[in-house]
From Swiss-Prot:
Pfam families documented for this protein: SH3BGR
Domains (record comment): The SH3-binding motif is buried in the tertiary structure, and it is therefore unclear whether it directly mediates protein-binding.
Cellular localisation: Cytoplasm, Cytosol; Cell membrane
Subunit description: Monomer. Interacts with PFN1/Profilin-1. Interacts with ERBB2. Interacts with ATG12. Interacts with BECN1. Interacts with translating ribosomes.
Keyword Membrane: yes
Name of the featured protein: Adapter SH3BGRL
Organism: Homo sapiens (Human)
Keywords (A to Z) from UniProt: Cell membrane, Cytoplasm, Membrane, SH3-binding
Gene from which this protein is expressed: SH3BGRL
GO cellular component: cytoplasm; cytosol; extracellular exosome; extracellular space; nucleus; plasma membrane
C-alpha cells in the first residue's frame, strides 16, 4: 500500500504550503512511505485528485485544495482530517496502516482491545 499525498508545488498560498509541509514532514519523520503527486505540474494528477475526492468531502464551491491524502486509490482525507488524527494519536488508522509496535498509537489500540 502506498500513501499518496496530492500537493501543489507552486501554490501561492502560504497556508497551503504550510499544511503540505506539515503532512510530508510528519510522514518523513515517522518513516511512513509515501509518494508526492504534484497537481500544479501534472494535469493528470490534478484531474485524478479532483475526480477521486468524495462528493461529501468537497468544498461547497470550487475544487478540493491540497494536501489531499489517499492510500492507493482510497481517499483518506484532507489536512484537517490528518491534523485531527495526529492530535488523537490515530494517524496510522487514518492512513489505513497498521501502527508499528511500540508507537503511541499501537499502545492506545492495545489498551482499547484489552
Amino acid at each position: 500500500m502506498v500513501i499518496r499525498v496530492y500537493i501543489a508545488s507552486s501554490s501561492g498560498s502560504t497556508a497551503i504550503k504550510k499544511k503540505q509541509q506539515d503532512v510530508l514532514g510528519f510522514l518523513e519523520a515517522n518513516k511512513i512511505g509515501f509518494e508526492e503527486k504534484d497537481i500544479a505540474a501534472n494535469e493528470e494528477n490534478r484531474k485524478w485528485m479532483r475526480e477521486n475526492v468524495p462528493e461529501n468531502s468537497r468544498p461547497a464551491t470550487g475544487y478540493p485544495l491540497p494536501p489531499q491524502i489517499f492510500n492507493e486509490s482510497q481517499y483518506r482525507g484532507d489536512y484537517d482530517a490528518f491534523f485531527e488524527a495526529r492530535e488523537n494519536n490515530a494517524v496510522y488508522a487514518f492512513l489505513g496502516l497498521t501502527a508499528p509496535p511500540g508507537s503511541k498509537e499501537a499502545e492506545v489500540q492495545a489498551k482499547q482491545q484489552a
